Amino acid sequence: MRNNKNQMYIIKIFIAIAMITGIIFLYLFYSSLTTSKLKETSNMDDSLKIKFTLIEQQGKKFDSTNLQGYLSLIYFGTTYSLYDNQALKRVEDIIKILKRENILLQVVFITLDPEHDTSEVLKKYLEKIDSNFIGLTGRVQDIEQLAQQFKVFYTSKIFDVKTNEYALQHSNFVYLISSDGKILSHYYLGS
């Protein structure tokens, strides 16, 4: 039994290292290219350039132009999900490692439940994880539209009578966004 736990721990470490290596590789690769070379060699389509306007945790407007000039990681979730909390902790661990290598990323958490996750709720939630993370909320239809752009699958919010809590099932990916607002890649954060 203990041996299985050790094996699972080692597997999780290897997965985390692979994710970090992939992010570092993509950052170094894309940052070394000039804009013209990027257009010539990239197989990314302009349709993957995201556009949105939402509200950040301070109550101010935040749109896709705020991503320009920064390599960003975007994660979709809810503030009341233990699983999302763990996923953001993994992202935070990756960010700490990258900071030691002088690779700076902007992290954006976008709620899938804007009716619950208001700016104030996001602010309190992200202060507990990392106050540098940006939390975004907005109108339900704006969140739905953005989730469709990212191909995020999620269900309607349901109340679980067993746990006396809300639940919202969703896909669990973090998206790497270029400094010009294009989706470069996505990474599964595991279960």
Curated annotation (Swiss-Prot):
Listed Pfam families: SCO1-SenC
Entry coiled-coil feature ranges: none
Cited Gene3D superfamilies: Glutaredoxin
Superkingdom in the source lineage: Bacteria
SUPFAM superfamilies associated with the record: Thioredoxin-like
Family per record: Belongs to the SCO1/2 family.
Name of the molecule in the record: SCO2-like protein RP031
Source species: Rickettsia prowazekii (strain Madrid E)
